[in-house]
Amino acid sequence: MLLTGKAHHPKSCPPFFFTLGLSSPFSCAAYLAMAWYWISTRLKQRELSSILLLLPVINQAQASDFVNFQSVDTSLYMQFENRVDPRKTISPILEAFGDYSVGDMYVYSIWQNSLQSDYTGDKSTYYYKLVPRISFSKVTDHDISFGPLKDILFAQWVAKTKSMNYDYFPGISIDWQADWISWLRTIFYFENNAKGSWNDQRIHIDYGIPFNNRLGDFRVVGTFDYTLGLHGQPETIDFKPELHYDLGKFLGNQPGHLWTGIVLNPIKNKYKIKDTPYYRTDQFSYGIFIRYSFF
């Protein structure tokens, strides 16, 4: 979910998802091998092998006309003042994005671990989701963009949380365009959640806004989710803005790869659990992260 820029030759660096270019004191292949081994070893133990098997298959498709662009990001987040979950957590995250001849797909996986020694619940959990989208413009080979409207897509949100059934949300996505944004998407989902019923609806917004000043290159990226709270459920608001700073460029390396920054995450009725004086589910958490983007 980042900016597009100079790519490395595919023979020297695997072409994956979300990024710009690459320059580091060690080779991309070595970094990828170490990161992939570390993540796969742990996530496979947690029933996430399907995600891990998916990415190499996508990578092999790079040589065909089906793939326009793809990249992968790895990151490490420390989060504080959570509610429901452990108050302090550390979480390795793997994200991927691909642009294809018929649409695009976003993949996200997180392995969350407690840093709170007195937490009595599950100290480790995982969550992953796949969001494939089919583009009306690409399928019909007809550009429907007009003014701020860029495209209309059919979207699907397939997600899994540890010890829970799958969520499946089909929806309609509207992509927007403007000179000052990298991307802006609005998606309306019908929720068929882990309880196995079509009992809610969701509005999802995600965005990327780059800017720079005398301190360097920045971007604001994030998501906003609002569930309507149908059929007696509490409405939920989940806002997660992040401020990214291009640390790699500051250190003299090629821009667009090594990032650091802060994240805020105010939530109302977290996990659709009604906030009460006896059990608080409204939160305002914050955190820091380091992130590496590569092809």
Predicted regions and their residues:
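Short loop/turn motifs that connect adjacent beta-strands in outer-membrane beta-barrel proteins
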Residues: S64-Q70, V102-Y106, F136-L153, Q177-R185, ...
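Outer-membrane beta-barrel transmembrane domain signature
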Residues: Y189-W259, N265-K270, Y292-F295
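Membrane-embedded beta-strands of outer-membrane beta-barrel proteins
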Residues: L94, L130, P170-I174, I203-Y207, ...
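Transmembrane beta-barrel strands of outer-membrane/channel proteins
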Residues: T74-F80, V107-W111, F154-V158, T186-F190, ...
